[in-house]
């Protein structure tokens, strides 16, 4: 396994961003946000929804549900993620 390997969360969010995959984000309080991931860091996700940008704190997110399957092993450094 490569030491420069990206973690599964980052690989997942990055593919959502790069492929512009629509997502539903479920928050811990039960709210749902629908949109496209535009960026993320260690603590937040930027979601574009209805032409507006939302900064969502990761500690408030329970689930990220993409509208279609996400390939997190698209690049060699991701192939062993989760194994």
Swiss-Prot record:
One of its GO terms (molecular function) is RNA binding. It holds the Pfam family Hfq. Gene3D superfamilies: 2.30.30.100. One of its GO terms (biological process) is regulation of translation, ncRNA-mediated. Keywords: RNA-binding, Stress response. GO terms for cellular component: cytosol. HAMAP family: Hfq. Homohexamer. This is RNA-binding protein Hfq.
């Amino acid at each position: 396994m490569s030491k420069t390997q990206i973690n599964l969360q980052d690989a997942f969010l990055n593919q959502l961003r790069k492929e512009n995959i629509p997502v539903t984000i479920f928050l811990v309080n039960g709210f749902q946000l629908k949109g496209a991931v535009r960026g993320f860091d260690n603590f937040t996700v930027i979601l574009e929804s209805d032409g507006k940008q939302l900064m969502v704190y990761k500690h408030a997110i329970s689930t990220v549900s993409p509208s279609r399957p996400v390939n997190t092993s698209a690049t060699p450094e991701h192939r062993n993620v989760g194994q």
